[in-house]
Amino acid sequence: MNMQVNGQAMIGRRGFLTWGGQLAAAGAISAFAPARAWAQAVDLYPTIRTQFESYVSSGKLPGLLATIGRAAGMPDVVAIGTQGLGETTPVNIDTLWRVYSMTKPVTGIAAMILVDEGKMKLDQPIADFLPEFANMTVLTDPDNSMDAVPAKTQITLRHLLTHTAGLGYSIITKGPLLQAYLDNGITPGIVSRFPIPGQTASAPTPDIKTFSERLAKLPLVAEPGTKWIYSISLDLLGRVIEVASGMDFEAFLKARIFEPLKMTSSYFQVPQSEIKRFVSNYAPVNGVLFPIDPASTSIYLNKPAFAFGGAGMVTSARDYDRFLNMLANHGELDGVRVMSTATAKLAMSDLLPSAVTTDGTFAEGAGFGAGGRVGKGMNAGVFGWGGAAGTVAFVDPRTKLRAVCMAQYMPSNVYPFQQDFAKWVLKDIGFPA
């Protein structure tokens, strides 16, 4: 039987991306990988190369890949290792990886395309599209009770984009609301076909419409617009996009982002024909890598209940680099404009409600834009996010610097990989760490 494991199973609560004001970037591909319009650049990034080699040679990870771009065109690539333990296929720019929450910025940008076209507004109540959210309630004691009072504020698009809607997340939420989420299939994400000891399995709702309807019947953790709480808001946003656009969410992504940007290796279900370039996912346990989702039998080979806008994508470094390159150029790539310059800049700006900060959270010290973190201070203008299986990506439109780093292990906080990666990149490109 296929087991769809609740995201809490292998995802560290603070392991999605501990950016801490640091940038993250890198790339990995083996010198033996077939040439497909890219070139190995390990000599340009000695720190990244050394660290990647250390992770792989010590058996901590089978393969790592990163891309770093500082101008238009193809990025530099650094790659070490293979697609899985005991395998000989080297990782390369077209290898497929589970990027989990790095799906969120893609969904956020999809919503901003509709804002650009006037089909949605940032501060428009989502109840205009999903009437079931017109009369929400808010828990009075979220960790201990389901007692709730009527919400004073309507959930808006801005709230969904910035995790300030007051929604929960099965990987973070506690108490009786967590059980209600599990009972109702409010678990938009998949990890493994197999049960994981000590973790609760819960199948997602059968479709995104049911997901929205069931979620609307459950209380919020906080009043909308008052607190930053990492949540399922980007998954719900997929349903808002469907109604606002009149298109299936996944079809909208393909038509408005993937196809225009020539992102030909981005999926929510990995085709059988592409298994040969799909990596396996591992859980490090007492120094040993345990395969929780082998590529050959991956749960991602099955059609998901729906396209999870918060954690469902499988993609290549080449594809995600093209997404970032479009953002670096404020909405345009290779002569194809995805959104206006003004809207692209808006999407990567701090969209948090005026009274909300990320203080006291794992995103502390940053703002939040359309599904991704926004740097402040010396990192002002940097936009990006990470994934639960060790991936991370960012773009700085001011300098045109962009980077994607791919790894595949859970929980991501087992190793300091995502945090350290920033230091390696900064050192290799000549910036003080």
Model-assigned labels for residue ranges:
Residues M1-G12, Q22-A25, S30:
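N-terminal secretory signal peptides
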Residues A37-A41:
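Boundary at the C-terminal end of the N-terminal hydrophobic targeting segment
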Residues V42-V99, K119-K121, N135-N144, M378-A380, ...:
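Short, conserved catalytic-motif segment at the N-terminal edge
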Residues F52, A72, R98-I126, L234-E242, ...:
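Active-site SXXK
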Residues V77, T137-A380:
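Short, surface-exposed loop or secondary-structure junction motifs
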Residues A127-N135:
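Acidic helix-start/capping segments at beta-turn-to-alpha-helix junctions
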Residues W385-A433:
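Structured C-terminal helix/loop/strand segments within mature extracytoplasmic catalytic/sensor domains
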